[in-house]
Amino acid sequence: MGTPQKDVIIKSDAPDTLLLEKHADYIASYGSKKDDYEYCMSEYLRMSGIYWGLTVMDLMGQLHRMNREEILAFIKSCQHECGGISASIGHDPHLLYTLSAVQILTLYDSINVIDVNKVVEYVKGLQKEDGSFAGDIWGEIDTRFSFCAVATLALLGKLDAINVEKAIEFVLSCMNFDGGFGCRPGSESHAGQIYCCTGFLAITSQLHQVNSDLLGWWLCERQLPSGGLNGRPEKLPDVCYSWWVLASLKIIGRLHWIDREKLRNFILACQDEETGGFADRPGDMVDPFHTLFGIAGLSLLGEEQIKPVNPVFCMPEEVLQRVNVQPELVS
C-alpha cells in the first residue's frame, strides 16, 4: 500500500478574494509593535524581515507608509568593518542579510548609505577555491549563498569582482538526475535550492545549462490536489512555495504548466480575514514572510492589483529596470 498523500483541505468558507488593504495595514503596524514577543524573538533575522515587509508594501503600492529614514539608519548601523551586514545591531555579518540590506537600499534608491566597496570585498572574501560561497566566516557552504553573492553583486554592478566561472561550475555540480538542485553536490533536490540555483544561472546567463522540461516536470509535481505547492515530495503545501516553485517555473519558461486557478485559490485561502496577512496554510498564524511570498506568488499569476514582480530578485520589476538589472529568463 502506498504512502497517503499529505495535503490540506480548504474549507468552503475560506477567503476567496484578495484582501489587499488588510495586508497593507498588517505590515504597516507590524514594525510599530517593538515590544511584542513575536517582534523581539525575530531579532536574529530582522534585516530580512524588513526586506519582506518593504517589498510586499512596494508590490501593493504602499511603500510610503514605511519609515524610510529609520530603516536607512538601521542598515547603516548594521554594516561591519569587514563590509558585511548583520541581521541586527550587534549581530555577526552574514551574506543573506547583506543581500537583504542591498535589496532594501535598491528599493529606496539609497545604496550610498553603505560602503559599497567594502560590501564587494566582503562577498569576494567568502568565495572558496571550488567556486562555492560560505554564508559567513564560520564557513557553511550552500547554493543559497552562491545566489546571495551574485544577486548582491549584480545589484551593485560589481559581478566581475568574483570568479564567476568557478561559481558557475560549483552550482552546476549541484544539479541532480531529476533536473533539480540541492544545497551541495549530491544533496536532495529542494524547491528553495532550485529557486536559488535557477536565479543564480539567470544572473550569470547560464540557463541554457538547465534541462527546463525535466526540471519543469519536477516543479509541477509539487502541486497537490488542494492547489498548493510543497518544496519536495511527501511534504505539506506551504504558501512560501507559491514563490520558490512558481518563480523557478517562470525563470525556466514553464509557468504555464501549473494549474494556476487552483494555486490562486490555495494562496487566497491562507489569508487571515480579521488581521490581514498570509499564513503557511489555511487557518495558521500569519507572518510577514508568508505575506510577501503569497503576494509575490499572486503577482506571478497575473494579479492586476499587485505590481509585476521580478522572479529572480523578488523585487518589483520597475525597480530592476531603474537600476538596469535584467537577468536572463527562458522564453
Swiss-Prot record:
Source organism per UniProt: Homo sapiens
GO molecular function list: Rab geranylgeranyltransferase activity; small GTPase binding; zinc ion binding
Top-level taxon of origin: Eukaryota
Self-association state and partner proteins as the record states: Heterotrimer composed of RABGGTA, RABGGTB and CHM; within this trimer, RABGGTA and RABGGTB form the catalytic component B, while CHM (component A) mediates peptide substrate binding. The Rab GGTase dimer (RGGT) interacts with CHM (component A) prior to Rab protein binding; the association is stabilized by geranylgeranyl pyrophosphate (GGpp). The CHM:RGGT:Rab complex is destabilized by GGpp. Interaction of RABGGTB with prenylated PTP4A2 precludes its association with RABGGTA and inhibits enzyme activity. Interacts with CHODL.
Catalytically driven reaction(s): geranylgeranyl diphosphate + L-cysteinyl-[protein] = S-geranylgeranyl-L-cysteinyl-[protein] + diphosphate
Activity regulation: The enzymatic reaction requires the aid of a Rab escort protein (also called component A).
An individual GO BP term: endoplasmic reticulum to Golgi vesicle-mediated transport
Pfam family, one: Prenyltrans
Keyword ATP-binding found: no
Recorded GO CC terms: cytosol; plasma membrane; Rab-protein geranylgeranyltransferase complex
Residues given in the record as Zn(2+) binding sites: 238, 240, 290
Positions bearing Phosphothreonine: 3
Modification N-acetylglycine, positions: 2
PANTHER family linked to this entry: GERANYLGERANYL TRANSFERASE TYPE BETA SUBUNIT, GERANYLGERANYL TRANSFERASE TYPE-2 SUBUNIT BETA
Protein name: Geranylgeranyl transferase type-2 subunit beta
Needed cofactors: Zn(2+)
E.C. number(s) listed in UniProt: 2.5.1.60
Keywords tagged on the record: Acetylation, Metal-binding, Phosphoprotein, Prenyltransferase, Repeat, Transferase, Zinc
Manner of cofactor binding, per the entry note: Binds 1 zinc ion per subunit.
DNA damage as UniProt keyword: no
TM segment ranges: none
